Design a protein with these regions (language model features):
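Winged helix-turn-helix DNA-binding recognition segment
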Residues: 59-121
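Intrinsic disorder/low-complexity segments enriched in polar/small residues
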Residues: 3-5, 103, 131
């Protein structure tokens, strides 16, 4: 069966309802509501917003691992290959999402002595410049 845009329609899954405490069984990625509601971020793609949420999740692991630079800023390592796998996207899409987040200032990416890139996930609610 073909949909409007020429893609095959997905088969509807036969799933159960949530009962009682089952609704609390999952862990979740953090996606700040402001990324959806704040006009500063209205032009960012939803995929890039999701990537930012994944980066926030990785940042908590970085804190536990002691990944801080000489200025005590926490950073993450997130390869293109991992982004592609996590979001089921092409290399071009992953690169474009990183560029989009970097262009608006949500992340900074630095190359350290030929090693893997490190990414600083920026805190947009800490009183920084209004975009």
């Amino acid at each position: 069966m073909e949909g409007e845009r020429g893609t095959a329609l997905m088969e509807r899954l036969k799933l159960e309802f949530y009962y009682g405490q089952e609704a609390e069984q999952f862990t979740f990625y953090r996606l700040p509501k402001a990324l959806i509601t704040d006009d500063r971020f209205k032009d960012i793609s939803n995929n890039s917003k999701l990537l930012y949420g994944l980066m926030l999740d990785r940042m908590s692991l970085s804190v536990r691992s002691g990944w801080f630079d000489e200025e005590n800023r926490v950073y993450i390592k997130y390869s293109l290959k991992s982004i592609m796998a996590d979001l089921n996207c092409s290399k071009m899409t992953a690169v474009n999402m990183l560029k989009e987040l970097q262009a608006i200032g949500l992340i900074d990416v630095e190359q350290k002595n030929g090693l893997a890139n490190i990414i600083y996930v920026k805190n947009f609610v800490s009183g920084g410049d209004e975009a």
